[in-house]
Design a protein with these regions (language model features):
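Bacterial N-terminal signal peptides that target proteins for export
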Residues: 1-6
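Acidic/histidine-rich catalytic neighborhood of metal-dependent amide-processing enzymes
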Residues: 145-231, 501
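An extended, acidic, His-containing surface patch that forms the Zn2+-binding/catalytic region
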Residues: 222, 280-354, 367-378, 383, ...
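A non-catalytic alpha/beta surface segment that caps or lines the substrate-entry region
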Residues: 40, 50-103, 118, 122
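N-terminal hydrophobic or amphipathic helices/low-complexity stretches enriched
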Residues: 19-56, 71, 114-115, 232
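N-terminal signal peptide c-region/cleavage motif recognized by signal peptidases
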Residues: 14-17
Length: 502
């Protein structure tokens, strides 16, 4: 048999391979290229793509566009007003009847260097979450799947991009034609509230027509089971300042007489949420869309993780009296910070001049950000608060006993896609094929991703492909990516490219 005939036969054999065959072939490819794949993630993490570094964001966008070009994609870089570029890619697959858009973001959260065990932009491999540093480049594969690569963006969200690229490379090496036309949208402003995303998507709506959006963001279920999700909670931030005296006052001379803004803030918190974490603001949840039977069944099938997580987090109790996933289906109020007076060595016996509460609300389908703001402000006024937008002057202070300044941050609503649609069934089947068994199916991720924008503009199913480990320290110091999760991500993306159909 000549070489050309042998090559053609190899392609024919590879073409109709079963799901199990593809999974095994992709895993074999990955095993043979582990060092190169980790090297690609290492290289990407070294690019400083955080909001404070516009040059780093631009360089990262250019790097990623080049990665798509070398793989045969038609590419473009979309930006407006100096915003970080959105990297777009298109690869048509002959005969494909569906088009899937693969979304991820390449920007990361800001860093506080003193809190990191190592330079966040010089990736380090460790043998566990609190493990020792490893010289992985000198080690021989296969690498221990429990090893973790530490660095900003390693999990959120650069690992999704590398999984996509590695999966594409695997399919090309295996001569597997994608079952869908592939479009790529990689954003550089997600961690900064996606300020320009809506406008750019509207401008390029024609290029972004598809049958499904696949979102590469978020962690897998805490059981470490391969996971897909069908939505995400919305988000809305609020900074509230409560005012006390014009200057700090000696608490021996004026305590019990001059109102203490820190105590007022503590009282306000207990009026917004009870001891079980449930929101007690009147009418707050009136507009919430209930879960469907299919969504409730999906939650009931999830592996229990609560006992293990209590040990991992060092807590004796949980709030709400329900499973973790069930609790994330409800709206929530989180007190993300309180500032008032002094503590520790700087503590003094004084009544502080103000107290600042930083709050984030998580929304669920049915709620809107304007509607939530109206309900919160109506609640405050009913409790006797005078709501202001600017720092109050003396006249205002003397006229009103309880003054609170509200500074609402950016936000967006929640989304839950239909878990029973044909596209959903196709994604579930491909994900199960990649996993080689059952997967965790979440009606909605507890965290927030601005996927509502995609829904409002394009009206197609939006489904998440999370791959990060649940303990990846996303947004915090010592962010990390567990290798087993990276390997699972490559298998997942390969299945979405080669087997997705409906």
């Amino acid at each position: 048999m000549n070489r050309l005939a042998a090559a053609c036969l190899a392609v024919l054999i590879a073409g109709p391979a079963s799901a199990a065959d593809l999974r095994a072939q992709v895993n074999d490819y990955r095993a043979a290229h582990e060092a190169a794949i980790i090297g690609q993630l290492d290289e990407l993490v070294r690019l400083k793509s955080i909001a404070a570094d516009s040059q780093g964001l631009a360089a990262t966008g250019a790097y990623l566009e080049s990665q798509l070009k070398t793989r045969g994609f038609d590419t473009a870089s979309w930006s407006v007003g100096g915003s970080p570029p959105i990297v777009y890619g298109l690869l048509k697959s002959p005969g494909a009847k569906r088009t899937a858009i693969f979304y991820a973001h390449y920007d990361g959260q800001p860093i506080t260097r003193a809190q990191w065990s190592s330079d966040p932009f010089v990736p380090v491999m460790r043998d566990g979450l609190a493990g020792k540093d490893l010289g992985w480049k000198a080690a021989k594969p296969p690498f221990n799947p429990e090893w973790r690569l530490f660095g900003r963006g390693a999990a959120d969200d650069k690992s999704a991009i590398i999984s996509f690229l590695a999966a594409f490379d695997a399919l090309k090496a295996l001569h597997r034609k994608p079952s869908v036309n592939i479009k790529v949208v990689w954003e550089g402003e997600e961690e900064a509230s996606s300020a320009h995303l809506d406008g750019i998507l509207k401008t390029h709506a024609a290029e972004l027509q598809s049958d499904v959006w696949l979102i590469g963001d978020g962690p897998v279920h805490q059981s470490r089971t391969p996971t897909i999700y069908f939505g995400a909670r919305g988000s809305l931030g609020l900074d509230a300042t409560i005012y006390g005296p014009l200057r700090a006052l000696h608490d021996g001379h004026y305590g019990n007489w001059v109102p203490n803004p820190a105590a007022m803030a503590a009282e306000l918190i207990t009026q917004m949420r009870d001891g079980e974490g449930r929101i007690i603001i009147p009418d707050f949840a009136d507009d919430v869309r209930p879960l469907t039977d299919a969504e409730r069944s999906a939650i009931a099938r999830l592996p229990p993780v609560e006992g293990g997580l209590k040990k991992e987090f060092g807590i004796a109790r949980t709030e709400g009296g329900e499973s973790l996933t069930a609790s994330t289906m409800r709206p929530s109020i989180n007190i993300r910070g309180i500032r008032s007076g002094q503590v520790g060595a700087e503590a003094n016996n004084a009544i502080p001049v103000d107290a600042v509460l930083s709050v984030d609300f998580r929304l669920v389908p049915g709620q809107t950000t304007p509607g939530l703001q109206d309900k919160v402000e109506a609640f405050l006024k009913a409790k006797g608060w005078t709501v202001v937008r600017e720092t109050p002057d003396t006249v205002t202070r003397l006229a009103h006993p309880r003054i609170i300044k509200l500074n609402w941050g950016g936000g967006y609503p929640a989304l839950r896609s239909d878990m029973t649609s044909p596209a959903a069934k196709g994604v579930i089947a491909a994900a199960q094929s990649a996993a080689g068994g059952p997967i965790a199916i979440l009606p909605m991720m507890g965290g927030s991703v601005p996927i509502n924008t995609f829904d409002e503009l394009f009206h197609v199913p939006i489904i998440g492909l999370p791959i990060g480990n649940h303990d990846n320290n996303q947004h915090a110091a010592n962010e990390n990516m567990r290798l087993r999760n990276l390997w699972d991500g490559i298998a997942l993306y390969a299945a979405m490219m080669a087997q997705l159909d409906w």
